[in-house]
């Protein structure tokens, strides 16, 4: 196809108003992209100056997307770009990247990045030569542009992956330095010079970010670079051409150059500013840097900051970077000594004014309060903010040099409070008071710990903070709420002051100004956490929740959801009357958050975080009503659309949170509805396609489906859940590219089926064992090998003759027994077990081995029985001891935490299983809360080889029918049966035992009698309770 025709198709695909024509053009492009030289022809359209710019732009987007998808195919995918086409593209893109308009250069840069990251140096070794040659030509922008992309590839690479950048630095930096030097000495430099300098700085930054390349350790070479950096940093920017608009001015090339130089100097100071942190090889260089440059940079920074003191301009990001440098200097004696003479001016005339409410804040407050709120709670904004850097400077100053500075600064704040109180209403310094309150809130940790301030905090709040809740200045009402929240947990001598602050904050939720309402909600979280008497809040809880959801409709912020979580935690079951409404509102808020995709990355990020917060809050509500199962049926329909949509690729960013909701509903609903069953295929499809990292999370609802909906799991044929489970597990277990640790939930699932569906899934025992044994042969991680062996144990417990017959038919029964007994015997240096460390592991092994022990003489090989018997004796005693240790630890924990509030019941990572004999259908509120914690802490199901046995405690295990089986009773019943049915066999077995094993047998016999008595007692108590209830 000729170029004009292709250009028409590209234009039609992007701009045709006719949908059919647009679809046809897109289809043509999809077909053409697989033809040779397609990519080359698209590139020719992009660089054709005679073509319409909009068509060229459309072609550049198509070009970028195609390269991103196909330049470096994923493993197993076919490479659809011919090597010859790649060579042409690589050569031509270098020529044209500096010639196309900036709007196209952005797309070309993305393409170059993809190609360089994929091909350099292996497939594109000549790239460095091209850069070096073009750095020596008059027009260097293209070479700088390419070198910037090349250097960025290695910016965050670790040592072994950084090797190629060393040659890049060696061969290009001498030329870069020459170019930089020429640019610095241009008279009346243009903006193009600034753009070139900025590019050079960004290249330098990428090359030094993780380590300083060896050529720069040469003092002469390094000094030459530093001289040029300081020259640009110190010299005034040109007055001509500087934009008036503050937003455009901060992005102006000359200010950008200063910003990148400040970046570089901060990085060098962080790396070489402290001799104590240097290795021997770097010590001499670090000393040279400190002597020659650390103080010089400090002096230069102070001069720059002085400009804003006298009304000059400095971009926010540059101020932020300079204050970071000064903050890092406070702890170093030599640097602090240089800073000290300037400290009063710096602290009171530069830093503090930056902390105060200013004209830009007022303009944003008035014109776009939503943006004001977003910026105030945006972590990324904090990284760039002069105000945050000022707060950090003050914090570091009072922390490291508090003796001489803390009293002085607090007195300065107190003086502002006095001036404010003494001034008439029309002359009150509202903005200074705002800065003083910010300072008091910022230093809350220090003030709470230091006398005499600690004793005066309550009085300070009453005199200087509480009155501002009714200030005519909205920003002071907001700041009062924030400061009150910072001090909500101090010990109030007069509880009425706590109550007053709490009710002022609650009133602030109805303020006319949005930022006041938001700050009040966030402060409320601190007050609820600190509140000892919930009667303070109970009467206004409905109003609180109403105001809360009005605010959620206005603002997308994850902290709003955190506040709601705190309310739900604190009130527990009391929240149940509001649970349905809360979930409805949160679901609506969630959809609003994910529908805010408007091309603004900052807004998208805020919306995504807020969406996660909504889902977390929903989970917290579901946990709080876990002892009221009937409510789940009302809430489920509100959440089903979210679950259905977000269990697909659309929900990858919230997949874990959605699985948590699925887990709660499938755990606590009276029955699992057909609508909830419809989510099974979505989870399984995701698991195979992209969600292997979430396998432990998916395990929880799958377990619930199988164990709580066993009948439906076994009988349903459309879809066939049994077949679907096998299809997924067999694919995953056969995939050698998946790590053992990622597959640990797979054998757990097989065990769940065998335990839950005993006698009903005979047809699956052989395939389960086959896939398990195939994976066992190559398994390396010990915890994964244990889980695979436990599938065999579960198969024996499911149907011993069937499972043993399958192993014998496979010809590996002896091999499996040998491996199993060997793993049971393996010990660490400490003497602790290397394998089967958890209670659940031991119990599964005991049940499987006891099932083998119970086989008649003709079915189990005679040489295996003594090994089985001895292994059981050791396992049972170890299991008994572990249960006792866990019970003791739990008792001690209850003694320590008996008075803790409901929130502490969530901290169940180290709690033991509830007991073997508890009927899961008769779980009380306490057990339900533990199960809720179990559903919440998904990752606890993975064993961790890094734990020592001393630190190790069992996972909260998923409930199973084997919880009702007492392994001691099962074993002793099997022993008794053998004594009765085959006395000679039993005598032969016991005669081979040495005194150690006789002792173990005696211990187990005594403990079993104790267990029988306990079981009988529990049974009688349950019968008695049932009689009373009836």
Swiss-Prot record:
Cited Pfam families: Cse1 (PF08506), IBN_N (PF03810)
Compartment(s): Cytoplasm; Nucleus
Traits of the deletion mutant: No visible phenotype under normal growth conditions.
N-acetylmethionine: residues bearing it: 1
Protein transport recorded as keyword: yes
Family as reported in the entry's similarity comment: Belongs to the importin beta family.
All copies of domain Importin N-terminal, residue ranges: 25-99
Region described as Disordered: 886-928, 940-964
Keyword tags: Acetylation, Cytoplasm, Nucleus, Protein transport, Transport
Gene Ontology MF: a single term: small GTPase binding
Coiled coil: none
Function: Functions probably in nuclear protein import, either by acting as autonomous nuclear transport receptor or as an adapter-like protein in association with other importin subunits.
Protein name, per record: Importin beta-like SAD2 homolog
Organism field: Arabidopsis thaliana (Mouse-ear cress)
InterPro entries: ARM-like, ARM-type_fold, Importin-beta_N, XPO2_central
């Amino acid at each position: 196809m000729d170029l004009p025709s292709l250009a028409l198709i590209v234009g039609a695909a992007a701009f045709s108003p006719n949908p059919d024509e647009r679809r046809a053009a897109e289809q043509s492009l999809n077909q053409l992209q697989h033809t040779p030289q397609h990519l080359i022809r698209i590139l020719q359209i992009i660089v054709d100056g005679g073509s319409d710019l909009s068509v060229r732009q459309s072609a550049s987007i198509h070009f970028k997307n195609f390269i991103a998808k196909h330049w470096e195919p994923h493993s197993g995918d076919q490479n659809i770009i011919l090597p010859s086409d790649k060579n042409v593209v690589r050569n031509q893109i270098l020529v044209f990247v500096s010639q196309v308009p900036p709007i196209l250069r952005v797309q070309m840069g993305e393409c170059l990045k993809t190609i360089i990251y994929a091909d350099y140096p292996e497939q594109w070794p000549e790239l460095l030569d091209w850069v070096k040659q073009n750095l020596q030509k008059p027009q260097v922008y293209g070479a700088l542009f390419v070198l910037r992309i090349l250097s960025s590839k290695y910016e965050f690479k670790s040592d072994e992956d950084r090797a190629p950048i060393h040659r890049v630095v060696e061969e290009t930096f001498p030329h870069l330095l020459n170019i930089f030097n020429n640019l610095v000495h241009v008279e009346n430099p243009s903006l193009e010079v600034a753009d070139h300098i900025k590019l050079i700085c960004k290249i330098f930054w990428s090359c030094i970010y993780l380590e300083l390349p060896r050529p720069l350790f040469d003092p002469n070479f390094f000094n030459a670079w530093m001289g040029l950096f300081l020259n640009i940093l110190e010299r005034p920017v040109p007055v001509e051409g500087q934009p008036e608009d503050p937003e455009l001015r901060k992005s102006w090339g000359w200010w950008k150059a200063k910003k990148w130089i400040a970046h570089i100097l901060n990085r060098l100071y962080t790396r070489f500013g402290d001799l104590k942190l240097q290795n021997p090889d770097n010590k001499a260089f670090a000393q040279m840097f400190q002597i020659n440059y650390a103080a010089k940079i400090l002096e230069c920074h102070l001069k720059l900051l002085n400009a804003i003191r006298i009304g000059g301009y400095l971009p926010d990001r540059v101020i932020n970077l300079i204050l970071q440098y000064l903050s890092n200097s406070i702890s170093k004696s030599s640097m602090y000594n240089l800073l000290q003479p300037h400290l009063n001016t710096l602290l009171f005339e530069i830093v503090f004014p930056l902390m105060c409410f200013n004209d830009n804040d007022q303009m944003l407050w008035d014109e776009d309060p939503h943006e004001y709120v977003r910026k105030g709670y945006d972590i990324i904004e904090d990284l760039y903010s002069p105000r945050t850097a000022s707060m950090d400077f003050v914090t570091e100053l009072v922390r490291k040099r508090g003796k001489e500075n803390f009293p002085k600064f607090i007195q300065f704040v107190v003086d502002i409070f006095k001036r404010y109180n003494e001034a008439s209403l029309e002359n009150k310094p509202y903005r200074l008071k705002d800065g003083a309150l910010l300072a008091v809130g910022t230093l809350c940790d220090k003030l709470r710990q230091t006398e005499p301030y600690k004793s005066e905090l309550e009085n300070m709040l009453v005199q200087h903070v509480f009155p501002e809740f009714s200030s005519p200045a909205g920003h002071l009402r907001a700041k009062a709420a924030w400061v009150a929240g910072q001090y909500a947990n101090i010990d109030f001598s007069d509880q009425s002051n706590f109550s007053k602050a709490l009710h002022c904050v609650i009133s602030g939720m109805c303020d006319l100004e949005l930022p006041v309402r938001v700050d009040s909600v966030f402060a409320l979280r601190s007050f609820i956490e600190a509140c000892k008497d919930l009667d303070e809040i109970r009467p206004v809880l409905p109003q609180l929740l109403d105001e809360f959801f009005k605010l959620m409709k206005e603002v997308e912020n994850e902290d709003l959801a955190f506040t709601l979580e705190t309310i739900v935690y604190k009130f527990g079951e009391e929240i149940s009357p509001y649970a349905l409404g809360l979930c409805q509102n949160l679901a609506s808020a969630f959809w609003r958050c994910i529908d805010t995709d408007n091309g603004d990355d900052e807004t998208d990020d805020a919306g995504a975080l807020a969406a996660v917060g909504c889902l977390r809050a929903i989970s917290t509500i579901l946990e709080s009503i876990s002892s009221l199962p009937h409510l789940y049926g009302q809430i489920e329909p509100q959440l089903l659309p979210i679950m259905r949509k977000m269990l697909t690729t659309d929900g990858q960013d919230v997949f874990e949170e959605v699985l948590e909701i699925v887990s709660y509903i499938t755990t606590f609903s009276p029955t699992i509805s057909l609508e909830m069953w419809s989510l099974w295929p979505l989870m399984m499809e995701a698991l195979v396609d992209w969600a292997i990292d979430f396998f432990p999370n998916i395990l929880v609802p799958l377990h619930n489906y199988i164990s709580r909906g066993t009948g439906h799991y076994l009988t349903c044929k459309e879809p066939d859940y049994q077949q679907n489970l096998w299809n997924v597990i067999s694919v995953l277990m056969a995939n050698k590219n998946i790590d053992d640790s990622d597959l640990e939930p797979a054998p757990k699932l097989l065990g769940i089926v065998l335990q839950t569906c005993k006698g009903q899934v005979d047809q699956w025992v052989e395939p389960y064992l086959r896939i398990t044994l195939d994976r066992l042969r190559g398994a390396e991680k010990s915890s994964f090998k244990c889980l695979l062996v436990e599938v065999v144990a579960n198969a024996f417990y499911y149907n011993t003759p069937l499972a043993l017959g399958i192993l014998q038919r496979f010809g590996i029964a002896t091999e499996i027994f040998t491996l199993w007994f060997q793993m049971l015997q393996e010990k660490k240096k400490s003497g602790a077990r290397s394998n089967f460390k958890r209670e659940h592991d031991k119990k599964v092994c005991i049940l499987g081995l006891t099932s083998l022990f119970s086989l008649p003489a003709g079915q189990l090989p005679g040489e295996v029985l003594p090994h089985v018997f001895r292994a059981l004796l050791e396992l049972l005693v170890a299991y008994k001891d572990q249960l006792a240790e866990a019970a003791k630890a739990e008792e001690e924990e209850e003694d320590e935490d008996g008075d803790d509030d409901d929130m502490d019941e969530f901290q169940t990572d180290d709690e033991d299983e509830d007991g073997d004999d508890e009927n899961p259908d008769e779980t009380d509120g306490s057990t339900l809360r533990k199960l809720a914690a179990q559903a919440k802490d998904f990752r606890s199901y993975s064993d961790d080889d890094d734990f020592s046995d001393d630190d190790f405690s069992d996972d909260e295990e998923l409930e199973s029918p084997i919880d009702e089986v007492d392994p001691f009773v099962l074993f002793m019943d099997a022993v008794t049966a053998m004594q009765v049915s085959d006395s000679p066999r039993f005598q032969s077995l016991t005669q081979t035992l040495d005194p150690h094993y006789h002792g173990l047998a005696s211990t187990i016999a005594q403990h079993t009698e104790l267990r029988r008595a306990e079981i009988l007692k529990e049974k009688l108590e349950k019968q008695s309770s049932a009689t009373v209830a009836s």
